[in-house]
């Protein structure tokens, strides 16, 4: 009998380091101002004080050529999506704080560099390695994982747009990056006809069946819709139907933003027009193929569709999500179809919506069982309407978040709504940054109800 261990998926549980980067004076000012406004909510004030600097102090590393590596947390890799979200609460400081501007600009430089390395990968290594060497085809040495997630491309443009709006400049010429993104998206509008992308993971290395794609790595059967095909969701789970509506919503928004950017910054009307045309195709595809009638909730957005008459009616905590559509800029928070969709996904009609003794909210297939994700609770607060009921919802959600940290003072990936001391991923920087962003965005609402 062989003495070699049986093949198994990699396990990662990197401990959170002590703070390794000093806060800037502007960051101290933000923390002081928020704490003063939340003097009547000490739990939430403490939570913000620990979450706001978490990405800055524990996940960032300076690289050559002005680039910045952003570790996701207890997994030692950089996700394009996570890294953009992790630095999101610092963007408002970029105009006046040179160190924050340099660091966030370095994140964008690194993202553009990684896209050039492999535009189909979702996560990358700090140094050459091959953690998932068993995937088919095998990823390159700088690639942590090569799951094609449409929102990865969107996140780079999202960060570029917001940095440009905050500072009036960018650390690179964005046009080659945008051209590469357009090339991939246009190809994936006709995945079966034009794309060479495949992804398979041997069963013995899959944590969940959704770690691989069906049909020999091509994903589920589908027909062209104008939307962009995505193999995987932002949860890193395979799509059931390969037109992921929230990711396409994100794409429709960031492509129009990118068009404005390249037109105003570079005077490039041709590239801007190409991005706008793709954005229009995607939006038309969403509104034609990504909407269906629900017997209880009426006209709603589906989470996924295949262009063949099938719709998956659910939502997942990870962003982009249907819940996040107004946050992404796709629609207003009072849009009728969005409100119908919101009612659906915040009910037991969504298989990932859970109600427990201590919390109610959306979870993910990525964490099977009754688990709620703080990211979803934050997004619910960020997209609540500016009405008395909506403001009360915001306050209740943030109070829930402050009470369900298991005494750690930080956000986690997920927790049991009946026993919040049971949670996953003690160091998950994306969730910490989104909590900070939620408090900053909703501070007037929270403070008025102290």
Residue ranges and their predicted role:
Residues 80, 116-120, 124-127, 131, ...:
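Extended ligand-binding clefts on enzyme/binding-domain cores
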Residues 76-104, 108-209, 429-443:
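Aromatic-rich carbohydrate-recognition surfaces in CAZymes
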Residues 2-81:
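Low-complexity, Ser/Thr/Pro/Gly-enriched N-terminal "stalk/linker" regions
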Residues 12-45, 98-103, 181-183, 192-206, ...:
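Long, acidic, intrinsically disordered low-complexity segments
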């Amino acid at each position: 009998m062989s003495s070699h261990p049986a093949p198994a998926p990699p396990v990662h549980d990197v401990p959170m380091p002590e703070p390794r980067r000093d806060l800037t004076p502007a960051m101290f000012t933000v923390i002081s101002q928020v704490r003063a406004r939340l003097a009547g909510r000490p739990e939430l004030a403490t939570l913000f004080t620990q979450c706001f600097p978490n990405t800055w102090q524990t996940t960032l590393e300076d690289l050559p050529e002005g680039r910045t590596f952003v570790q996701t947390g207890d997994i030692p890799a950089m996700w394009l999506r996570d890294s953009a979200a992790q630095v999101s609460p610092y963007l408002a400081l970029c105009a006046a704080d040179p160190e924050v501007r340099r660091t966030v600009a370095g994140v964008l430089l690194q993202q553009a560099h990684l896209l050039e390395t492999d535009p189909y990968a979702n996560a990358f290594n700090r140094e050459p390695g091959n953690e998932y060497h068993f995937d088919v085809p095998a990823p390159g040495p700088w690639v942590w994982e090569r799951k094609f997630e449409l929102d990865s491309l969107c996140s780079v443009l999202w960060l570029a747009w917001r940095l440009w709006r905050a500072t009036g400049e960018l650390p690179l010429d964005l046009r080659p990056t945008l051209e590469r993104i357009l090339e991939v998206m246009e190809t994936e509008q006709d995945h079966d006809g034009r794309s060479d992308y495949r992804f398979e993971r041997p069963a013995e290395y899959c944590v969940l069946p959704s770690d691989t794609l069906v049909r020999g790595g091509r994903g589920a059967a589908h027909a062209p819709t104008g939307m962009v095909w995505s193999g995987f969701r932002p949860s890193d789970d395979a799509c059931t139907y390969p037109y992921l509506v929230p990711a396409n919503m994100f794409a429709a928004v960031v492509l129009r933003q990118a068009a404005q950017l390249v037109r105003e910054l570079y005077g490039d009307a041709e590239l801007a027009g190409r991005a706008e045309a793709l954005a229009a195709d995607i939006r038309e595809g969403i509104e034609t193929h990504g909407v269906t009638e629900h017997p209880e909730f009426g006209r709603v957005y589906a989470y996924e569709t295949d262009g063949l008459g099938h719709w998956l009616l659910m939502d997942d905590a990870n962003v982009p999500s249907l819940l996040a559509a107004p946050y992404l800029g796709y629609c207003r928070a009072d849009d009728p179809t969005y409100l119908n969709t919101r009612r659906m996904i915040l009910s037991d009609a969504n298989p990932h919506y859970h109600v427990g003794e201590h919390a109610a909210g959306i979870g993910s297939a990525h964490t099977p069982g009754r688990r709620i994700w703080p990211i979803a609770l934050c997004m619910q607060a960020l997209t609540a309407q500016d009405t008395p009921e909506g403001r009360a919802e915001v306050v209740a959600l943030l109070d829930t978040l402050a009470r369900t940290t298991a005494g750690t003072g930080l956000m986690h990936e997920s927790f049991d709504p009946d026993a919040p001391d049971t949670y996953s991923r003690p160091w998950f920087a994306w969730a910490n940054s989104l909590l900070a962003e939620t408090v900053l965005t909703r501070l007037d609402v929270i403070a008025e109800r102290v």
